[in-house]
Amino acid sequence: MRSFLAPVVAAAALLAAACSQSPSAPSSLSPGAGGTLFSGASDAQAPHEVPFKGRLDGTVVVTPVNPPFFNVVITASGEATYLGRFSLTVPHLVNFATAEGEGDFTFTAANGDMLTAHFTGTADTSTPVFAIDEHATITGGTGRFAGASGSFDAHRHYDPVAQTTTGTIEGTIVMH
């Protein structure tokens, strides 16, 4: 009996001591205390960066507008981190005299979510297959890309005879 009473008496003494103390300020772990654990904030809602890296292959249609300006439309497909398999359209305007262009990327994921970006780029036209470097700023999207931001670089090769392009993309998407 004595071994049973000792823990009960110790627990009662501990409880009485805890209850006799005056209330303290809420801790950061208390509900509603403004801490992050229980304050209603969610890590899923906090902006976070994800890597964006992939490859693309496609066809190119070039239409003269008012030389040296040409409308160029790329229709491509590929695969990238976080996006998965995608289709891609890239309408843009190119000044063939300066080898500079500007336009938009629209990636469509397999589930229909879209990621959009605006870019500027330059081409090295000194060889039969042009080397093109583009820098893009992500402007948003739909589905899981709604409100997305970030940036990426595209490095492509364009064969003007075959009217094809291949390339890589690499950067980050900031999910909001």
Predicted regions and their residues:
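Intrinsically disordered, low-complexity proline-rich regions
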Residues: F4, S20-P23
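Flanking scaffold residues of small Cys/His-coordinated metal-binding clusters
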Residues: A11
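Bacterial N-terminal signal peptides that target proteins for export
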Residues: M1-V8
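Beta-strand-enriched cores of mature, soluble protein domains
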Residues: S22-H176
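C-terminal motif of bacterial Sec signal peptides marking the signal peptidase cleavage site
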Residues: L15-A18
